[in-house]
């Protein structure tokens, strides 16, 4: 199954307007100019933004702050009124919106209404789910919402393997939910959402890669993608999750048996120019690796997004990236510069 999908690509490009295209050109140009000059130059506003629907999750995945309940920041749900206000600010230039950061999006009761609102502004929408809440009704409502992309986590093809990473999860619920989505997409004769399984490759499941591909074909999803896993204590790998399949790992084994990151840690990062994250309570953080929102660029309850995007604190953070990315804590285990997706 190929990762390229023509319908999805056409759908994404259909969201482009002259204003969004010009904004994207400005953002891309300023990023490359910053790389070349080693000075932080920021033109335009984000092409893509991630909103956090909630910090809550029903699972206990061993490498996830939400699953481990290890946040020090407040937990809660994104509110519809606040989301609507933010979209009204961002929509003219915003092309791509992801509804995930931490937590399970479907636990927010307003989640699909948020999708509908973003879709009404002709923004491409995507979300990632563990698949446990794709009931028949939720599946129908998901297709009707106009959601453009649905990523379903499938980290094993048998319950015993699946639950080694998705602790507390039920594979049968994921498969049933997937069947519901595929059914309603056909029943409503809809081209969206583009549905694919995301298979997070860890040592317990790496022997099931081909089985997962066959399962994807059988269920009727549009594709499957293998994702390399982020391991927090990768040097020692106490949970024994780093796969032996080295091309599907972000880490390599050293002669002493410990691991190191494959990341060359070059002093630049595309994310800082085009794709920030907004937490459920309105904090703007630089990227999705700031799980605990330690690097707060601003609070949308006090300032507009464009004020925060252009303020000195954000510019200074970009400057630090360009001077010494390895010295920034959230960059130490970042995927910018290493292989994230495998074939």
Label each residue range with its predicted role.
Residues 101, 108, 136, 192, ...:
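Residue-level signal for alpha-helical context at structural boundaries
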Residues 52, 56-59, 264, 326-329:
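Disulfide-bonded cysteine motifs in exported proteins
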Residues 58-66, 289, 329-336:
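Local cysteine-cluster metal-coordination motifs and their immediate loop/turn environment
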Residues 2-149, 160, 164, 168-172, ...:
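Conserved alpha-helical substructure of the radical SAM core
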Residues 1-13, 52, 73, 78, ...:
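Radical SAM enzyme [4Fe-4S]-AdoMet core and its adjacent flexible, acidic
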